[in-house]
Amino acid sequence: LQINRSYSISGGKRFYIGKDKNPLSFFLTAGHTTDYQYTDEVIRNTTTSGTIYKDMQGKKYAENISQLLLANVDYDINNRHHVSYNLMMIHAGTQSVGDYTGKNSIFSDDYDNLGLTRRQQSNDNLLIVNQLLTNWGLTKSLSLDAGASYNMVKGYEPDRRINNITKAENGYTLLRGNSQQRYF
């Protein structure tokens, strides 16, 4: 039994450091969500003249995962200088599998072009943002703000596999030739 679920946690704390009691604070929040989906689908394609060359029905199962992390560390020095670090991480992943049966012209055979198509797909994306920010009070009326960041995006989308199996006298058989596909 697949049950949708979600978890999250957050917290923070402030400490005072040294004889000047300079505040150091941090905050963290994290979350994880998993959602499942099930759909009945119909796939139909025609030529420009209206001839149906694909007419399939099937079921698709999908799992969607989302993860989030946010963090902050902040330090004040003598109420004049300020340094902070921020981190954000977002991850999103989806995987699905669908089985479709019916007519497809790729199944050229004696069984009225009937067969089974299995389509599997994975999408995996990650974003990471790092920031370092500072504020320096040089005088009562002059300050310096500076910042730097390093960010990273990784996308593995899509990783897709399509397998076609044609109807045969004793069940199904794997098609020959270029009918199996893999995209990455």
Listing of model-derived features with the role each one plays in the protein:
Residues 1-99, 125-130:
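Transmembrane beta-barrel wall of Gram-negative outer-membrane proteins
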